[in-house]
Amino acid sequence: MLLALNTCGSTASIALGVADKDDVKILATAELAVRTYSARLIPEIAALLESRQATLRDVEAIVVVNGPGSFTGIRVGLSTAKGLAEGAGIPLIAVSRLALLAAASLLPHVLAAVDAGRSEYYVGEYLNGENLGEVLLSGEETVAVATQPGAGVLVCDESRADDVSPATSACSALAICGPVYVQPPDAAVALAFAMKRFRAGQFDDPETLNANYLRRSDAEVLRLARPAAK
C-alpha cells in the first residue's frame, strides 16, 4: 500500500493506493480545507488507513508533493510526510507540483504555470517528462517566456490566468495555442506519477529533503529563455 499527500494548493488531498501491474489502483481518497491542514492532516491519514483496515505498517512508501505553492501548506505536508517516514521507517518520494501539472497535460513540451500571488507565477519547463528548469516569474516574464520561438504549450491549473492570457496571440509555433487548463493534480495523481520511481526503488532521504518553494530568479533558468550559443 502507498500513501500520498498534496498540501500545496487551496485544498489538501490524501490518497491510498496499491501497485497494480504497470499502474496504481486507488483505494481511498480524502480532501481537507486549507484552514484545517495542520490540525486535521494526521487524523485524516489515520481515518483513511482505518477505512481500509490498515495501519502505517502496511504502507510501503509515502509520496509527498513538496511544492511549489502555499508556504504553510508545503511545510505542513512535508513535515508530516518526513515525520511518518522517519518514525515508521517508510521510504519517501517527493514530486514537484509543476511536474504533476505537466504530466497531466499529456503533451510533450510544456510550460506549467501556477499562480504564486501578487501577479507572479511558478513556471516549470518540461520536455518529455524531463525537468528543464523551474522558476518564479512575474506575469510579464511568464508571457515573454511563453511566446519565445519553440516554447511549449502553456498549462495552468487552478491559477488565475489573466496575466498570461496575452500568450494566446503569439503562439503560432505551438501545436495547441494558448493556455491549456488542467484539473489541479491531487494526491491520487501524485501517487500514479510516483509509481515509476517506486518500482525502481528511487527514494528521497527525509533528512536532506527540502521544500520546493521557488524563489525569485533569472528567467534564463528555463532552457528556452537562454541565449542561443554562437
Task: Locate predicted features.
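A general structural signal for well-ordered alpha-helical segments in protein cores
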Residues: 38, 42, 81, 187-191
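N-terminal beta-alpha supersecondary unit
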Residues: 1-66, 184
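Stable alpha-helical structural segments in soluble proteins, enriched in small hydrophobic residues
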Residues: 48-52, 87, 105, 187-198
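Surface "functional belts" at beta-alpha junctions
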Residues: 20-27, 31, 36-37, 91-186, ...
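DPxDG-like acidic metal-binding loop motif
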Residues: 61-92
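A short alpha-helix-loop-beta-strand transition element characteristic
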Residues: 202-206
